[in-house]
Amino acid sequence: VNGDGKMDENDRYGFTTHWNSATLNWSFAFDVRYIVKNAEGVPTLLPQSEKMADIMTKLYDFYYNGNRTLYMTDQLVSKLGYPSHDLAVAGTFEKNQTLFAALRIYVIDNLRNMEDPFAIIPFPKYDEAQTGYYTHVDGHAPLMILPKTLQQTDNAGIVMEALAYYSHELVVPAVY
């Protein structure tokens, strides 16, 4: 775009991401299972599938071959002066240097002053045969775990239900 003959942070891309933002999202979006319950109800790891191998091959090509993806490395984030990978991706999107950006929901707030309209859309399906769109709660989302030795499980459940309810009532409207 800037006419210097090389693709770098000064050009425009179709997609921008970083090491911990999109790769795992693709496997969820493409409905890949890593764990299933066996006949006894015990979670069991699944071996790598042909589908997963195909996804990884295509993602590698999408990320590293051609000039369609800007992949935010540690060096590039530092060079651009952003404090985090997430903010570097958001900044590139805000400056209209990328058409699609893989962002965590907490970063969206940084785009409130963006002049151009934007939308939050799901990752695409693996193929036309896939019945729905899928996602997951990102690794930066806190989760609650309870020790196996917990005696008052009913009380813990009540507290978690209340937190989930108020999160839905207060957080979801504030974000969306």
Model-derived features with residue positions:
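Non-transmembrane alpha-helical segments in soluble domains
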Residues: M56-Y60, A90, A156-A164
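Short helices/loops that flank or line small-molecule/ion binding pockets
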Residues: Y82-L99
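Sec-exported extracytoplasmic/periplasmic mature domains
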Residues: N2-G3, D61-N67, E161-H168
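Extracytoplasmic/periplasmic solute-binding protein
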Residues: V1-T44
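Glycine-centered hinge/linker elements that transmit conformational signals in sensory
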Residues: V36-P83
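Beta->alpha turn/N-cap motifs
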Residues: W19, L103-I108
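Extracytoplasmic/periplasmic substrate-recognition and gating elements
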Residues: R112-V175
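Loop/turn elements at helix/coil->beta-strand transitions in domains of secreted/extracellular proteins
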Residues: G3-G14, N67-R68, K95-L99, M114-A119, ...
